[in-house]
Amino acid sequence: MITYYVLFFIHLESRRICLAGVTRHPDQGWMEQMARNVTMEDAGFLINRRYLLHDRDRKYCSSFRQVIEAGSVQTLALPPRSPNLNAYAERWVRSVKEECLAKLILLGESSLRRALRHYEAHYHEERNHQGKDNVLLFPLPTQAVRGEPEKVRCRQRLGGLLKYYECEAA
């Protein structure tokens, strides 16, 4: 069995996820590159963000924090053994494991990346969120037909593992 490490970022207010990268060896160079990617001037996920909260894992090395701070984002290491202070990230990890990864047999890094990409889209566009009044975070624009229950269609991802039901357009 091979262990892969997934680096992701989550915007706490909107719950938007950014899958930064997947690797077998999250060394200093890889972490620095991921930090550069998310702080890029035009397309970085952390642009116009003030803080980056992270746990005290040694993977968040000083050079990673320096690159993040060079992008005008203050890094804040959470106290030890305090997962409740990072509850949204912890919940996303649990959700992706239970709803997706635990039900798949992944045959390498590319299949992991594919599953994560599909789950990220499902999480953003098709999955209701209790903490957000059971609405979709970023719904796709649709022309739903109201009052006609026979016009419901099912959209599937990952071979039917992830399902989403919506009203068909007329």
PLM regions: where:
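Charged DNA-binding/catalytic regions of mobile-element recombinases
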Residues: 1-170
